[in-house]
Amino acid sequence: MVKYFKLGEGLPVIVDVLRASSTIITALANGIIEVIPVKSKKEAFKFKKQGYLIAGEQYGRKIEGFDIGNSPVELLRAIKEGSWKKLALKTTNATKLLCSLSEAYIVSTLNLEVASRKLRGKEVSLIAVGSRHGLEEDMAVVLALNKGLNGARINYQWVKERVVNSRAAKHLRSIGYGSDVDFIVNTSYDVLPKLEKGIIKGYN
């Protein structure tokens, strides 16, 4: 059972750097118009029949029968090769949490700068999702975002080091997803996803 860390009270801000938040952000920054978090494989396959790209993982590894894993690098390749506009996502931890919420913002290292700007002045609850490998990389983003929301300068290099050296990052490298880790800490997008009524779209 994963125990979330929460800082503050207000609209949830979900941080799952490796990798759900990063996959969602990458999708919306690269032509996907909506992302649907799903609870089960069965639900994901229903969306596949409706023309959705389906992405997902269980304990880091791609779910059998899905188009891609929970991988921003695989997602970019799929978008380049196809004409996908909608994505359904199933992950071990984050999508379960997202499915339980009516509203939420989604943040990662990929959009830390824009999130600190757009969420400043709002009442929010910063939630580090974590995994069975811990939540150090998510905690780093939560703490950095909290600083940014309070007007302090964010130390992006410190955040990057926490993510790269986390147990979750080492696990991903060990199962062949090191390119995702490298992408996530070296890319920046100007998009802030928001979940409303089960659908995630870009927030303006």
Say what each PLM segment does.
Residues 28-31, 120, 142-144:
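Short, solvent-exposed amphipathic alpha-helical segments in soluble enzyme
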Residues 134:
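Double-stranded RNA-binding/processing signature
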Residues 8-10, 32-33, 49-52, 82-85, ...:
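Short coil/turn connectors at secondary-structure junctions
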Residues 1-6, 20-29, 38-84, 95:
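Residues that scaffold, gate, or flank divalent-cation-dependent active/transport sites
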Residues 61, 65-104, 137-204:
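Long, charged alpha-helical interface segments
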Residues 58, 91-92, 107-109, 128-130:
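Short, structured patches in soluble enzyme cores that scaffold and shape functional sites
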Residues 115-119:
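A short, acidic, amphipathic alpha-helical segment used as a generic capping/interface helix at domain edges
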Residues 12-15:
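Short hydrophobic beta-strand that contains or immediately precedes a catalytic carboxylate
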